[in-house]
């Protein structure tokens, strides 16, 4: 790959898209100066954590527009002309597509193509013959047959990506007009095809192994070096290939070395998907963990009791920490029903605000923080810890990132924070991360 590599700018719709790279910046704000930090950084890639998956379509659109508007100015001021833009989203196809890619294309303009690349190998998501699969207990299952396709906000009916595109664009892009990059094409090389793409043509890309995407990324970077402009709607694995960063500084099993104190840590669990609940059960069987359940039904039905609830939780946490144990703060596990999607999203904000007030009230000498759930993790970084940016250290488990707060953080200096997506890892994964941090 050539040295005049384009800067890779990732707009991440929840903060877990950096789950396959390391040593780069995650930005929690997108004012011009903060974006320039990312553009000027030595790493070839940086992430802007927009958290749009937790927002309404209208809000997602306006946030994306604001990022792109500021990005245009920041790019000009930094004198950067060669860049790739990635709208990083979910490997199970949930999220605001095509809203985000449409806005990026409108604002930054001139893209020759946009590619859907949802493969995420660490999480068992592969794409073959343009059909996207989730590997469940060793069996590749078309993703439209899983719980994710029935998501109450982002439901869809197709695993065959051209049909997914037609469904999501409401027929604006027809399935037959989608360029399909199959495994055989990718493995032989796609450069000639990439050079011919124009007018923001939609392409869908297969991937069974990291080597497939490495090959595709090589062709993408060559074409970009010749002046082609590309936009991506992808999961995390293509980022590994585009950034090409090599191995992380400290091995996953040794990342407990980043702890600033010898005290216990804290764990916060917001995600309510089935996998998280199973992982939580295993975690609570670990020595020196103590569960603190937050009754979300009570929060919904008696909002006036919120302050009392917060005070009770923080009191429990303080006692647990004093006893040299790790509090595991989690929301009650049932997914509540609401009269409308809007009401559900609004209540999500109420729960998140409570969780973030808990984070702000954690003992100041905790040695680590684990945040479970994508949206929860975003809120922990931007609201709970009020970070402008954080340096990504790497992954403590495949697909599970660790960042560190700055040395001058007012509440938690040099605190390692684990960003653990809701639907990643086996049932022992959360317990494994806890064990690694206790070493």
What kind of region is each of these model predictions?
Residues 2-12, 19-22, 35-37, 44, ...:
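Cap/lid and interdomain-hinge subdomains that line or gate substrate/regulatory clefts
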Residues 310-374:
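C-terminal structural cap/anchor segments
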Residues 133-313:
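Conserved, well-structured core segments that form the ligand-binding/active-site neighborhood
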Residues 19-49, 312-325, 391-410:
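N-terminal short beta-loop-beta anion/metal-coordinating cradle
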Residues 24-27, 366-367, 375-425, 429:
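Conserved, well-ordered active-site substructure
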Residues 20-23, 96-100, 125-132, 188, ...:
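Short acidic, glycine/serine/threonine-rich loops at helix termini
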Residues 11-12, 47-50, 87-88, 115-119, ...:
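Short beta-strand segments
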Residues 15-17, 89-99, 121-123, 209-212, ...:
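Gly/Ser/Thr-rich loops at beta-strand to alpha-helix junctions
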């Amino acid at each position: 790959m050539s040295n005049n590599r384009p800067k890779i700018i990732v707009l991440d719709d929840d903060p877990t898209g950096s789950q396959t790279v390391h040593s780069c910046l995650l930005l929690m704000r997108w004012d011009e100066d903060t974006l320039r930090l990312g553009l000027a950084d030595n790493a070839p890639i940086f992430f802007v954590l927009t958290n749009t998956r937790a927002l309404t379509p209208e809000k997602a659109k306006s946030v994306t527009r604001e990022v792109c508007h500021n990005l245009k100015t920041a790019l000009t001021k930094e004198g950067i002309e060669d860049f790739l833009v990635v709208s990083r989203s979910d490997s199970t196809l949930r999220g605001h597509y095509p809203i985000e890619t449409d806005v990026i294309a409108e604002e930054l303009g001139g893209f020759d193509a946009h590619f859907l690349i949802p493969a995420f190998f660490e999480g068992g998501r592969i794409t073959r013959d343009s059909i996207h699969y989730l590997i469940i207990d060793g069996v590749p299952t078309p993703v439209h047959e899983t719980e994710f396709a029935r998501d109450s906000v982002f439901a869809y009916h197709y695993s065959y990506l051209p049909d997914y595109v037609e469904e999501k664009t409401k027929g604006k892009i027809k399935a037959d007009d989608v360029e399909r990059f199959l495994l055989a094409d990718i493995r032989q090389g796609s450069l000639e095809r990439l050079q011919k793409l124009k007018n923001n043509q939609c392409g869908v890309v297969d991937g069974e192994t990291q080597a497939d995407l490495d090959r595709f990324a090589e062709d993408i970077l060559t074409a970009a070096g010749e002046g082609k402009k590309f936009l991506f709607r992808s999961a995390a694995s293509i980022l590994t290939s585009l950034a090409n960063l090599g191995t992380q500084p400290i091995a996953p099993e040794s990342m407990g070395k980043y702890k600033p104190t010898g005290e216990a840590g804290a764990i916060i669990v917001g995600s309510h998907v089935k996998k998280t609940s199973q992982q939580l059960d295993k975690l609570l069987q670990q020595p020196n963990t103590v569960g603190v359940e937050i009754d979300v039904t009570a929060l919904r039905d008696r909002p006036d009791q919120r302050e009392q609830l917060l005070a009770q939780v923080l009191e429990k946490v303080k006692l647990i920490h004093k006893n040299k144990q790790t509090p595991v703060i989690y929301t009650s596990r049932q997914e509540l029903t609401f009269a409308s999607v809007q009401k559900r999203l609004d209540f999500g904000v109420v729960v998140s605000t409570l969780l973030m007030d808990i984070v702000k009230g954690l003992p100041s000498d905790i040695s680590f923080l684990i945040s479970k759930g994508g949206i929860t993790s975003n809120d922990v970084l931007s609201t709970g810890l009020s970070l402008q940016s954080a340096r990504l250290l790497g992954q403590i488990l495949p697909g599970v990132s660790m960042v560190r707060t700055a040395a001058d953080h007012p509440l938690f200096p040099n605190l390692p924070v684990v960003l653990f997506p809701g639907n990643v890892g086996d049932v022992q994964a959360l317990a494994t991360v806890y064990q690694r941090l206790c070493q």
